[in-house]
């Protein structure tokens, strides 16, 4: 740019401005367009100053006073006034121009145009006429070329006379004294006014400011009047084809188009990687300086003024010009449907210039001037990149705000406006244009308004519409940091409009613009209050916020100290290769869950914020950068069909063993974290809110969870208030926990040392539980002095064992073995509440061998430790509290059996106890008490049965039947006899407790005793029915079982419930002193029956006689147990003579054969025998 005076400036106005001031001797009130500053000028050009006549060379704008005085007018037209100045005023016309001075309106070449275009009341004021003429653009009101030429020469002649400067010194006296730079300008050179224009923003004196503003408007009407502009941009104008600089080829208004064309060339260059045409550095500075000096009044941007004049009237009619207010108003309405396209384009160009130089925004430069200086965000600190200025300054000031520094409210307001502006229109960010052009054309064409393009690109980044290049993604991330919408959701217009209804309902308690609005929206994600459009926009923005911890202002404010101390982070707008933004949050959450022993923990406030972010990230895997990055392939491979909320993470957890190593580690770490703080699972917490409120509020209120909340949810999983979503979520987490014992936080913390010592290299939780529980059981059975498993681990191990019994899926080995059986026999049964396990038990005889074996093992474990029998514990929970509050877990079932027939016993519990008794009686191994009591008797009397037995299949009551027969013979040990008596008594009351009877007499029971078997309460009626119908039984095995029953009843009256009931009073009267057992009371009753002196109850007498007959019959048909029984049967048989004859004859025949056939062995000599 040419030197205008003794100091070279980035931009100077021509001397015309300074000399124009000379005619002003005061300020008067005028009318119409001249109102406000009533200075009446002599003959000079107006704002619309146009081209020169054809053939005239463009005037060389003066650089020195001598050049100004030597400037000659065009030769084609007579110069209306001398170069030295204006004609003498007629009639002493005052400065207002209302006297008899020279009138522009009276000149012949302009009279017709003034009369046609300008209101009559303005004719006497030259300034008003100039404003009127230069603001004309309609073709029908076009100014004649002669008038344009007059105006141009008028302005040009003014630039040649330096004597008018004194007037400006009078009008701006106090201002000049305040601005030292202007006061030091030499007098009479014309530089002082140019200096005042440079400092127009600092002028507070009203008259001076108005005067300088009006003069600036006049000069800005023609780029050729700007000092040095044409020298600096001449080549660029030709290169960019912005219009000829030859005289006469452009009309008055096209001179603003030249500047506009240069501006477009400047912004286009910034948007191309390899621009074909580059604007020279001098011209760039000139263009930006012109834009800066026109930043306060939109009249000074001639192209924008004419393009937006109608829109200004439509949208900003009541907005007063000055201080950039009209610009801002038009910016706010840029995307209105009724905004003209030419105005929108001009506004966009203006905004792009602001993006390159913040001073092009008057309001931003003025409001933030002191803050920029205070926080050293001045130009000297800027990077050299051409597009970084506005973004750098915004980030510099935002950094100060985030550090808690005080930035003026006016400046913050301006920052908010321009951040919103950048978010609304992607084209204002050169980096987006450069890096995302292909993606925009391919995915987001036609979405150019209200921030929709940026959100479209965000959607692509999230993987919902294709893929995005890394450069584009990085450009988007940078733009999000520059605009910082996390600090105020209103910056993102697309989000603001989409979520307005949600904010008004769900977040109305939070102040508008508060950063917590975004958190509130995240908390209501996937709820009834959330609308779909808001959900999409919110997740699109959160995708980027989650990748840079600084973009969450609340997190940054609460954690910047911890991040600096623990993660070695830098300032808000600084980055580090060693600790990239995405890695900082990972660092924070690793420290958030450290124990006090591990040290270096986060502050309480920061920890709460980290937990908040973790809760939000659990909503969507795409909000967890590390998870999405490492698991992208696995998500596509295993979870492509899992599109519902929260399903993707669950899917990854379900396929944990199949995932790639890096993805498995990430998912494993996240799951381990969830086990410590299940509130991270925000969707699960939302589903379980009623249960938490009613049953777990104490542990939920704890700031440190440590797995207590999940444990509480598991314990209350089957409460009536439990909803399906919560139950499914809790069960799923339990299933995930089975994959690795680390996923059970309390178990891990209680048993990690024991696992390392006793179960090394075991990973799966179920295997760890089996390993530890086996160790505990062995130590207990061997009565070891000291348990190898620590006490705290044993306690938590018990909790884990009990939890695993609730669902067959929590016991993977059993579940895998029985999958096909579940499908075949339990397809209609729901998982949970141990219902599938119970179903398998009921269908045990039909199960596959492998499943049957697993179920038998499970039952054996449950009988040894009834507390592990989930169904029994659930059904009999209240009865256990009533009858067995002090009972040990091992003796729980025994206690319940003893109280089974109590009147206070719950029928459902009684039914369940009976079920377990039936199970126990199928195999002695399922009855630990019997097994221990008969340890010596079983191998002694039932050895043959044991040799045929298999380890994992039932003996169907054979051993117990064997022991019952020995009980009748009174050959058992006392402990074993006591247990068999109890079993015999119970099975006498309920035939279902006798497996052998059920097995062999099922048809007879169905045919002969169907009514008795259908009775709800079994009191021995089926057994009595079989005894009565003994002669009708054809099946030998069934008959044998009934005979055995008769034999057992003879051993003890308690074993015959019908007889015992009938003879209860008689026993009390006649046999009270007799000790029960070994048939003693039965013998007493028999003696009483034979004694004529004793009168028994009729029912007792009848039953006794029936029993005697049955026993007599049984004795006849019962098979011999030994040789003595066999001899007795032969001697009492009616055919005994025949049997004895056959036996004797057989012996005689054998003797005769021996006599006749001789010896069988070979004869040898005596010598050989004696040897």
From Swiss-Prot:
The chain crosses the membrane at residues 1138-1158. Widely expressed; found in kidney, pancreatic islets, parathyroid, thyroid, adrenal tissue, brain neurons, astrocytes, adenohypophysis, cultured pheochromocytoma cells. Fucosylation is essential for binding to E-selectin. It comes from the Eukaryota. The modification Phosphoserine is found at residue 953. One of its GO terms (cellular component) is Golgi medial cisterna. Residues 54-71, 78-90 have a biased composition (Low complexity). Residues 1-32 form the signal peptide. The keyword Nucleus does not apply. Residues 43-105 are annotated as: Disordered. Residues 1159-1171 are cytoplasmic. The keyword Nucleus does not apply. Keywords: Cytoplasm, Cytoskeleton, Glycoprotein, Golgi apparatus, Membrane, Phosphoprotein, Repeat, Sialic acid, Signal, Transmembrane, Transmembrane helix. Glycans are attached at residues 157, 202, 573, 669, 778. Residues 33-1137 are extracellular. It is found in: Golgi apparatus membrane; Golgi outpost; Cytoplasm, Cytoskeleton, Microtubule organizing center. Residues 91-102 have a biased composition (Gly residues). Cys-rich GLG1 repeats lie at residues 108-141, 142-204, 207-270, 278-338, 339-405, 406-465, 467-529, 530-596, 601-660, 662-720, 721-780, 788-848, 850-903, 904-971, 972-1027, 1033-1093. Binds fibroblast growth factor and E-selectin (cell-adhesion lectin on endothelial cells mediating the binding of neutrophils). This is Golgi apparatus protein 1. It comes from Rattus norvegicus (Rat). The gene is Glg1.
């Amino acid at each position: 740019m040419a030197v205008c005076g003794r100091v070279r400036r980035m931009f100077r106005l021509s001397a015309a401005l300074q000399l124009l001031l000379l005619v002003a001797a005061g300020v008067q009130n005028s009318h119409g367009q001249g109102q406000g500053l009533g200075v009446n000028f002599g003959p000079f050009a107006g704002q619309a100053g146009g081209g020169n006549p054809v053939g005239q060379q463009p005037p060389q704008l003066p650089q020195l006073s001598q050049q100004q005085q030597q400037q000659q007018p065009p030769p084609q037209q007579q110069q209306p006034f001398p170069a030295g100045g204006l004609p003498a005023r007629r009639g002493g016309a005052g400065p207002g121009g209302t006297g008899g001075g020279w009138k522009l309106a009276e000149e012949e070449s302009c009279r017709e145009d003034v009369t046609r275009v300008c209101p009559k009341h303005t004719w006497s004021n030259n300034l008003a006429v100039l404003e009127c003429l230069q603001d004309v653009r309609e073709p029908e009101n076009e100014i004649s070329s002669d008038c344009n030429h007059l105006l141009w020469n008028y302005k040009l002649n003014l630039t040649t006379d330096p004597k008018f400067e004194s007037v400006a010194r009078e009008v701006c006296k106090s201002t000049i004294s305040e601005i030292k730079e202007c006061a030091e300008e030499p007098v009479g050179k014309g530089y002082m006014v140019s200096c005042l224009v440079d400092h127009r923003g600092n002028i507070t004196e009203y008259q001076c400011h108005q005067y300088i503003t009006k003069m600036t408007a006049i000069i800005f009407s023609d780029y050729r009047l700007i000092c040095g502009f044409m020298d600096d941009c001449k080549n660029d104008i030709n290169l960019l084809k912005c219009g000829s600089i030859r005289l006469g080829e452009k009309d008055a208004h096209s001179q603003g188009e030249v500047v506009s064309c240069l501006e477009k060339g400047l912004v286009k260059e910034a948007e191309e990687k390899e621009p074909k045409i580059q604007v020279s550095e001098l011209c760039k500075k000139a263009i930006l300086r012109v834009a800066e000096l026109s930043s306060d009044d939109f009249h000074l941007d001639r192209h924008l003024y004419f393009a937006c004049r109608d829109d200004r009237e439509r949208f900003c009619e009541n907005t007063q010009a000055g201080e950039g207010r009209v610009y801002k108003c038009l910016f706010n309405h840029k995307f209105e449907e009724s905004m003209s396209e030419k105005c929108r384009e001009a506004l966009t160009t203006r905004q792009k210039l602001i993006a390159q130089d913040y001073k092009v925004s008057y309001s931003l430069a003025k409001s933030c001037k002191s803050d920029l200086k205070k926080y050293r965000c001045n130009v000297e600190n800027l990077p050299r990149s051409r597009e970084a200025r506005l973004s750098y300054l915004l980030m510099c000031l935002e950094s100060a705000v985030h550090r808690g520094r005080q930035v003026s409210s006016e400046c913050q307001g301006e920052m908010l406006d321009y951040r919103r502006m950048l978010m609304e229109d992607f084209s204002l960010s050169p980096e987006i244009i450069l890096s995302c052009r292909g993606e925009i054309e391919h995915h987001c064409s036609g979405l150019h308004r209200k921030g929709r393009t940026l959100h479209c690109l965000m959607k692509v980044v999230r993987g919902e519409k294709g893929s995005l290049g890394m450069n584009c993604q990085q450009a988007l991330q940078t733009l999000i940091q520059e605009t910082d919408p996390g600090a105020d959701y209103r910056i993102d217009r697309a989000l603001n409009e989409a979520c307005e209804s949600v904010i008004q309902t769900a977040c109305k308690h939070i102040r508008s613009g508060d950063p917590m609005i975004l958190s509130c929206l995240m908390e209501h994600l996937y709820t009834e209050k959330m609308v779909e459009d808001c959900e999409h926009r919110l997740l699109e923005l959160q995708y980027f916020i989650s990748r840079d911890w600084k973009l969450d202002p609340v997190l940054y404010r609460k954690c910047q100290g911890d991040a600096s101390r623990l993660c070695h982070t830098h300032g808000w707008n600084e980055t580090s290769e060693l600790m990239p933004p995405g890695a900082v949050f990972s660092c924070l959450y690793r420290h958030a869950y450290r124990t006090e022993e591990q040290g270096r923990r986060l502050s309480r406030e920061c920890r709460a914020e980290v937990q908040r972010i973790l809760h939000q990230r659990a909503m969507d895997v795409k909000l967890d950068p590390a998870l999405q990055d490492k698991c992208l392939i696995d998500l596509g491979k295993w979870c492509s069909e899992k599109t519902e909320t929260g399903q993707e993470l669950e899917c990854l957890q379900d396929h944990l063993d199949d995932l790639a190593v890096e993805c498995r580690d990430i998912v494993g770490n996240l799951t381990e974290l969830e086990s410590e703080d299940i509130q991270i699972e925000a969707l699960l917490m939302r589903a379980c809110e009623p249960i938490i409120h009613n049953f777990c509020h104490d542990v939920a209120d704890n700031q440190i969870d440590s797995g207590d909340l999940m444990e509480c949810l598991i314990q209350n999983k089957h409460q009536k208030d439990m909803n399906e979503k919560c139950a499914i979520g809790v069960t799923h987490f339990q299933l995930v926990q089975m994959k690795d014992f680390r996923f059970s936080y309390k178990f891990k913390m209680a048993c990690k040392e024991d696992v390392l010592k006793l179960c090394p290299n075991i990973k799966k939780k179920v295997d760890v539980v089996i390993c530890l529980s086996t160790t505990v059981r062995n130590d207990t059975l061997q009565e070891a002095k000291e348990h190898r498993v620590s006490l705290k681990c044993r306690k938590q191990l018990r909790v884990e064992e009990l939890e695993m019994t609730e669902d067959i899926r929590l016991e993977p080995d059993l579940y895998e073995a029985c999958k096909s059986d579940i499908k075949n026999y339990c397809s209609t049964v729901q998982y949970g509440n141990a219902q599938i396990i119970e179903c398998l038990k009921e269908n045990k005889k039909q199960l596959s061998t492998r499943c049957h074996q697993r179920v038998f093992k499970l039952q054996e474990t449950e009988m040894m430790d009834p507390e592990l029998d989930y169904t029994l514990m659930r059904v009999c929970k209240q009865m256990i509290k009533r009858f067995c509050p002090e009972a040990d877990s091992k003796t729980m079932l025994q206690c319940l059996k003893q109280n089974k027939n109590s009147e206070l016993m719950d029928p459902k519990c009684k039914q369940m106890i009976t079920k377990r008794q039936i199970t126990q009686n199928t195999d002695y191994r399922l009855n630990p008490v019997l097994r221990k009591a008969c340890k010596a008797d079983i191998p002694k009397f039932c050895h043959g049965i044991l040799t045929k037995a298999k380890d994992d299949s039932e003996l169907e009551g054979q051993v117990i039947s064997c022991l019952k027969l020995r009980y009748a013979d009174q050959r058992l040990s006392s402990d074993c006899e006591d247990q068999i008596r109890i079993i015999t008594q119970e099975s006498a009351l309920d035939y279902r407790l006798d497996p052998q009877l059920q097995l062999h007499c099922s048809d007879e029971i169905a045919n002969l005793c169907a009514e008795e078997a259908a009775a709800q309460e079994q009191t021995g009626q089926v057994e009595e029915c079989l005894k009565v119908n003994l002669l009708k039984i054809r099946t030998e095995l069934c008959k044998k079982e009934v005979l055995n029953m008769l034999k057992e009843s003879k051993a003890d009256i308690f074993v015959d419930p019908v007889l015992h009931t009938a003879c209860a009073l008689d026993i009390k009267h006649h046999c009270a002193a007799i000790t029960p057992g070994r048939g003693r009371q039965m013998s007493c009753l028999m003696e009483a029956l034979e004694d004529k002196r004793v009168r028994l109850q009729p029912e007792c007498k009848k039953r006794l006689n029936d029993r005697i007959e049955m026993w007599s019959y049984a004795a006849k048909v019962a098979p011999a147990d030994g040789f003595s029984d066999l001899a007795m049967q032969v001697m009492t048989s009616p055919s005994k003579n025949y049997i004895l004859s056959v036996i004797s004859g057989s012996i005689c025949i054998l003797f005769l054969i021996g006599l006749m056939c001789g010896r069988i062995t070979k004869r040898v000599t005596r010598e050989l025998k004696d040897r």
